[in-house]
Every structure is written in C-alpha cells, then in structure tokens.
Curated annotation (Swiss-Prot):
This is Aspartyl/glutamyl-tRNA(Asn/Gln) amidotransferase subunit B. SMART domains: GatB_Yqey. GO terms for molecular function: asparaginyl-tRNA synthase (glutamine-hydrolyzing) activity; ATP binding; glutaminyl-tRNA synthase (glutamine-hydrolyzing) activity. It comes from Clostridium kluyveri (strain ATCC 8527 / DSM 555 / NBRC 12016 / NCIMB 10680 / K1). The gene is gatB. InterPro entries: Asn/Gln-tRNA_amidoTrfase_suB/E, Asn/Gln-tRNA_Trfase_suB/E_cat, Asn/Gln_amidotransferase, Asn/Gln_tRNA_amidoTrase-B-like, GatB, GatB_C_1, GatB_Yqey_C_2, Gln-tRNA_amidoTrfase_suB_CS.
Amino acid sequence: MEFEAVIGLEVHVELLTETKIYCGCSTAFGSEPNKHVCPVCLGLPGSLPRLNKKVVEYAIKAGLALNCSINNKSRMDRKNYFYADCPKNYQITQQEIPICREGFIEIRNHLGEKKRIGIERIHMEEDAGKLIHTDEGTLIDYNRAGIPLIEIVSKPDIRTSKEAVSYLEDLRNILKFIGVSDCKMEQGSLRCDCNISIRPKHNLKLGVKTEIKNMNSFKALEKAIQYEYKRQSDLIESGEKVRQETRRWNDAKNVTEVMRSKEYANDYRYFPEGDLTAINISDNYIDNIRKTIPELPDKKIDRFVEEFKISRKEIEILILNMEIGDFFENAAKLSGDPKSVSNWITGDISRLAKETGIPLNNLNFTERDLAELIEFINCGVISNNIGKKVIEEMFYKGKSPRQIIHEKGFVQNSSKEKILKVVKEVMEENPKSIEDYKKGKKKAVKFMIGMVMKKTKGNANPMLVNKLVEEEIGKY
C-alpha cells in the first residue's frame, strides 16, 4: 500500500525585543545564569505582568508578512501545567483569540513550482526557563523565562520532508527580512515541532498524528519526518496501530523516541488571563505597521531574476537578509554588471566574511566602491587576480579601489613591448617547456603563461600574455 504523509509544523520564534514580554528584564542571549530575572518572570507572589507593546507590534508585522488577518480584539490566556522550567506553574499564552489567523506562504517544490501552505494562526506567548542537566542534578536558568515568542501554526498542507524544510526556510527568511527575529536555530530563537500522520494515498481521512520535538536543524527536521513516515508505515502494514503521542528526535541515533502520551487542550485547563486586559488593535495601527514591511524575499527574487538576468539560486543567496539584497541591487545598478557583482559577493566577499566572522551587512566599503572595482577590471586597468588583492584591502581597511591601486602600484601592464620582453626571457629560461610543447604537451603553454604572470607580479594583462606566449612559442 502506498501512503502519503500529512504534516503540520508549529514554529516557535523568539522576537528581537530588548525586554521580555511581561517585564523589563533584558532578553540578551548568553549572559550568566539567572542574571536577567525579576519577581514577574520568576512568578513570585504579588508580581503583576504588563504586556510589552513591541511584542504586539512584531506579532502583527509577522502576521501581515505571512498574509494573515489580524484580530482587532485579542486576549491572553493561562495554560496551566507543572514543570520546573515554568516558575508560575502556568504560561501566559493565547488560546481562544490569537492575534493573527488564516494566512499562508508559497513555497517552491522540487520542480520549482509554487505551492501554498496555509497558516492557521499566530499567537503570542512567553518562553520557559532552561534546564541544565549535570552529574550532580538539574539546574535551572530563568534568563529565558518570559522571552517573547510567537508560535506560527501551519495547516496540515505539507506532504513531504522536503516541503517541510522549504516551508521552514522560507518562514525563517521572511521573519529575518522584516527584522522581528534573528531566527538562529543554534541559539534556540527558531524552534520547530512537527505533527505527522500518514494515510493511504488518495484517501482524505486523516490518520493518528504523532508530535515530534527536539529538532534543532533543518537536516534534523528532514530526517525526523522521513524516519517517522517509515515507522508509521511499518506499523500499519504489520497490522498494528499508531498511537497518539509526543516523541523526541534523537539526533545521535537517527530515531524518534517516546516522550509521553499526547496531551489535549483541556488537559491544560485554559482560561482568560485575569491580570492583563483585552488587546484592542485599531485598523489605523495595523496599517501603520503594514507600511514598515519591506519588499519580501519571494517578490524581490522574482524581480531580481527578471531585472538582472541571473539565476534564481544566486539571487536566493544574495537576499539572505535585506541589507545584502539592497547592497547587491545598488552595486548592480551603479556598475551595470550584475553578474560580476553577484560573483564578488557570493565569492571572495562571502569567503572573507566567513573567515573573519564579520557579517555581510557590516562591510567596510560601499556599493559604489564595489562598482568602481568592477569598472577598473572591465576597463583593463587591473586584472581579475589583482582585483582579488584589492577586495581584501577594501574588506580589511575600508579604502577605495582607486586609493589601493594607486598606493600599491597595481595598475595593469598592457604594454606589448614590456610584456613581450618578459615572455622572451621566460622562454629562454625554460627550454624544456619548449621541447615539451613540440612534443604536443599543451600544459607547457599554461606553464609559460603562469611564469610570465609571476614575473610581472600579476600586473600584466592576462589576455595579452596569452596571445604573446602562443605567438612566440609557435615560432619554435
């Protein structure tokens, strides 16, 4: 029997606010344990929460970017459960009236075709503390307690592990692009739970779903779905039943493991949060937030592909964040050579950024500087190899290409007489290479060209060097 998976994702996203959702404690990551805490986020008796307005703004901004409707009236609810990392023994979240509902994003499948994935709801909530297990016992860091989250719940429109990864990647890109989260999975600011069931293909009846947790990377999400699909398929084909339960992905063993039987909403005894008033959002407030949303990644990609005639794959790398996309666009227009701009950004500039840890959106030079460098290369003032040396100086010292070329004496030598003199010297010094050429060894020509470039310290015009070497060696 052939089965298909029915998959929905619940994505928890930490918002880039300076303070927590219900108090004024800092949200700074990586501080010493329990430094950013107060009576409110520790759940001490008598402490009262106050909703952070920036959290509401960012939740609405995310909802609009994800094509959601925004509820003009919303409220917070208590979700009651007892666990060590939840100091109040309840979480302030949204159950009945979430801030956003009925949205969608469009992903691309393996054929490059668009597929719409529905978003059921987006709601605001607080994060829990962090448990740290040691040989002596379990410690609790409450710095994370009260960090503002939005939970984005997709509809069960996803059918494969590849689609799930594509959805999560697109979601991450949008949220980073609009500046509401840094979406760093390695720091836990983007976390994903997966609900998956299987059913016979072309059968509309849903199967019993399993929730999978502890997937800390896109690869883990893909592998967990593939494993769970096979596990459930094997159970059904052997006549056994799939149980509704929560499972944990074990990255070391590449398996899912049982955590607990699946809870239902009434297990949490939700009821309205009495310490916070209802949230009233005007249409004017929503419209003002809408105006702050930039051109989103998918539309920008389509426009760049059409306008600059370079591949979608290259463009996807160039717009990983808004600043890089804007840098590329401005440099492409200034230089009139978008392909070269793309090559420099995705090549040498990205390499230098990775080696130094300097982010691409914090470069020492401007779009005009890169356009000027490309113009010098295209006009033959310097070679592409010299351009690589210039870009390093630009990257580290922030000088303009013109200044670097002048200071270093990098101007390309295009004098036929001077280059021909070096070519003849190289041939006199390497008679064996000439003999190799006579025997049909084409590598001898490349060797000669390399030696000429070495002698001229890379300043010779490479096209002229090629031409003169081939002409001279052909005389032997």
